[in-house]
A protein has these predicted regions:
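Histidine/lysine/aspartate-rich catalytic loop segments that bind and position anionic ligands
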Residues: 146-177
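Internal active-site segments that recognize and position negatively charged phosphoryl groups
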Residues: 120-154
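C-terminal functional extensions of proteins
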Residues: 191, 200-212, 220-256
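N-terminal beta-loop-helix "entrance" segment that forms/cooperates
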Residues: 31-54, 111, 165-170
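Glycine-rich, highly charged phosphate/nucleotide-binding loops
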Residues: 46-63, 174-183
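N-terminal basic/disordered segments at the start of proteins
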Residues: 6-36
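Short, polar loop motifs at secondary-structure junctions
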Residues: 32-40, 100-106, 139-142, 157-163
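Glycine/small-residue-rich loop that forms an oxyanion/phosphate-binding "nest" at active or ligand-binding sites
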Residues: 59-120
Length: 256
C-alpha cells in the first residue's frame, strides 16, 4: 500500500485541528468533506469538498472509487444521520473507520439541568407560562419554537435562520464561537433570560453559556446525544492520531 488516503467528514473545530495535524505530518492524502450548511466556513488546511454524498450507499461508492483506506467521522455530535451513513459506508466499502467525538458536558454543583431527548421535548418542558428563552441549538432547530409561541426567544446561529420561524417575540444573534463567560453572562442578563435550550455538544467553544447559567441560576433544558454508533470512538485529536498510527505504521505511511 502507498500513502494512506483518508476522508474526514468535518464541520467541527476538532476536524479542522485534525486536518491541520495530518497536513503537518505530510504522510497521507487527506480530503476534508463539509456538508455545506454554513455560508462562510472557516479556512481549512487540506483540500476540501463541499456538499452531501446522496446517502450511505453513495458515500460507500465514493470511498471505493477514491481508493480510501480510512474514514474519520468528525462531524457534530448531533449529526446523527451523517454518522449513521458513515458507519454503514465504512462497513460496506471494507475500510477502517474512526469517530472523533468530544466528551459530553457533565453536570456540576450549581447546575440546574432538565434532561430531555429532543428539541421539541425541551420546548414542551418550558411549560405553558411565558418565559424568556435562549434557544442555543443553531438554526436547524429554531422552527420547533413555533410550537410554543407564548415565549420570548433569543435565537443564536452562525448563519441567519431562513425562513425565520413564525414568532411574534423573537430576537436573533448571528455569531460564531468560541464564546467567553463574560460575554455569555452579559447576553443572558441583557435579555433577561430565564431558560436555556442547549444540546450537550461538549467542548470548550460553547460551554461558556452553561457556566453563565450556573452563575445566574438559570434552568437549562439539556438535549441528550443519541446513542453512539458501533464505530471505534475517540475523544481527542491526539487519540485520533494515535489510532491512525496503529492502523498505518510509519513505513506504510511513507509509502515504503
Amino acid at each position: 500500500m502507498g500513502r494512506p488516503r483518508i476522508l474526514i467528514l468535518g464541520g467541527t473545530g476538532e476536524a479542522r485541528l485534525l486536518a491541520a495535524a495530518l497536513a503537518m505530518r505530510g504522510n497521507g492524502d487527506v480530503l476534508l468533506s463539509l456538508a455545506g450548511r454554513t455560508e462562510k466556513p472557516a479556512a481549512q488546511p487540506v483540500p476540501v469538498r463541499v456538499g452531501g454524498f446522496g446517502g450511505a450507499a453513495a458515500l460507500a461508492d465514493f470511498l471505493k472509487a477514491g481508493g480510501y483506506h480510512l474514514l474519520i467521522d468528525a462531524t457534530h455530535p448531533f449529526a446523527e444521520r451523517i454518522s449513521a451513513n458513515a458507519a454503514f459506508a465504512a462497513e460496506a466499502s471494507g475500510i477502517a473507520a474512526i469517530a472523533l467525538r468530544r466528551p459530553e458536558w457533565q453536570r456540576l454543583p450549581g447546575d440546574c439541568w432538565y434532561d430531555v431527548q429532543s428539541i421539541p421535548a425541551a420546548i414542551e418542558a418550558l411549560g405553558p407560562s411565558p418565559r424568556r428563552v435562549f434557544l442555543a441549538t443553531g438554526r436547524q432547530g429554531a422552527h420547533h419554537a413555533e410550537a410554543a409561541p407564548q415565549h420570548f426567544y433569543l435565537i443564536r446561529s452562525v448563519d441567519p435562520v431562513e425562513p425565520p420561524p413564525a414568532l411574534a417575540n423573537v430576537d436573533y444573534v448571528i455569531d460564531r464561537g468560541p464564546f467567553t463567560l463574560e460575554g455569555e453572562y452579559a447576553l443572558l442578563k441583557r435579555h433577561r433570560i430565564d431558560a436555556i435550550i442547549a444540546k450537550n455538544s461538549g467542548g470548550a467553544a460553547t460551554y461558556a453559556k452553561i457556566e453563565a447559567a450556573r452563575l445566574l441560576g438559570i434552568e437549562v433544558m439539556m438535549v441528550a446525544r443519541a446513542p453512539a454508533s458501533a464505530v471505534k470512538t475517540v475523544e481527542t485529536v491526539e487519540a485520533t492520531l494515535a489510532a491512525i498510527d496503529h492502523l498505518f505504521p510509519p513505513a506504510m505511511k511513507r509509502g515504503v
